[in-house]
């Protein structure tokens, strides 16, 4: 999916955006609806960041917003771990996120949601979600990496 005009990419720059993406996608989709724009909104979000505003999935599902969330599941708050290193505060508790059932939670809020393990599964689910008239959450397992600050 390539941006093909103005208002196609909405980003939050800087380190003050953790937790912003789930709700921002809802806002963009609602604004599109008000303007008569028909398109899928894509939210690319980390599993840690998603925890800050996961309840926005309920809003998206209730309004039948055409949002495709791709949630990268690395089982940790990578950005917060990087900040801990930067601030020389090692061993901060609570930054590992094992066992999150993001797809299960999303289904509970009323979204279509799947866990994918392969690139092929991701591609198929993403293509299907782009044509859906509801909110889809695709959870992709990724490897933890040090976040860039």
Question: What name fits each language-model region?
Answer:
Residues 1-149:
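Thiamine diphosphate
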């Amino acid at each position: 999916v390539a941006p093909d005009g103005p208002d196609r990419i909405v980003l939050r720059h800087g380190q003050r955006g953790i937790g912003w993406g789930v709700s921002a996608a809802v806002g963009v989709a609602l604004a599109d609806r008000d303007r008569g724009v028909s398109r899928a909104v894509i939210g690319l979000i980390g599993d840690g960041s998603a925890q800050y505003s996961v309840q926005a999935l309920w809003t998206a599902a209730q309004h039948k917003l055409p949002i495709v969330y791709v949630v990268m599941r690395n089982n940790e708050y990578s950005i917060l771990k990087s900040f801990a290193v930067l601030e020389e505060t090692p061993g901060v508790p609570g930054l590992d996120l094992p066992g999150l059932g993001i797809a299960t939670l999303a289904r509970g809020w009323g979204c279509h949601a799947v866990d994918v393990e392969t690139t092929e599964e991701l591609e198929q689910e993403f293509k299907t979600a782009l044509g859906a008239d509801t909110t889809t959450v695709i959870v992709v397992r990724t490897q933890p990496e040090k976040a860039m600050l």
